[in-house]
A protein has these predicted regions:
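Feature activates predominantly on carbohydrate-active enzymes
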Residues: 1-135
Length: 135
């Protein structure tokens, strides 16, 4: 496909082409735990990854800041959990999260394009949002 774009006339030069990846897992990790990444950007990344034959997209969905930046006070330290949770509705981050419906749609898009989504919920190390949850 890249050759046809380079030729400009949608024709391939005469010859044989072998096109296969050297590695079984060709991945990328996006950290949306520390900074919210809009769903539209995640969809764009899935499409771009499929184009470049990348097949594994790990999305980091929870994290917290360093307490040193918050006067060493865990109660004031920023934390985020980015997936909608019906069981614990107050758990999701106020500055952005993904609904179940839109995250499932992202997984379905990725599946159609040959990209596996690996949702990463990092515990116990980055679980401040979970430990501070109050109903």
């Amino acid at each position: 496909l890249q050759l046809t774009e380079q030729q400009g006339n949608q024709a391939l030069p005469k010859g044989a082409a072998r096109d296969y990846p050297d590695y079984a897992i060709r991945g990328f990790m996006m950290d949306s735990g520390r900074k919210f990444i809009p769903m539209s950007m995640l969809r764009d990344y899935v499409k771009m990854m499929a184009y470049y034959k990348m097949n594994t997209f790990q999305i980091h969905l929870n994290d917290n800041a360093f307490k040193q930046y918050y006067n060493h006070d865990w109660n004031k330290t920023y934390s985020a959990f980015r997936l909608e949770c019906e069981t614990f509705p107050g758990l999701t981050a106020r500055d952005g999260y993904y609904t179940k419906k839109e995250f499932i749609a992202l997984q379905q898009l990725a599946d159609r394009l040959g990209v596996e989504i690996i949702p990463e919920i990092d515990v116990p190390a980055h679980s401040l949002a979970l430990t501070q949850y109050k109903q």
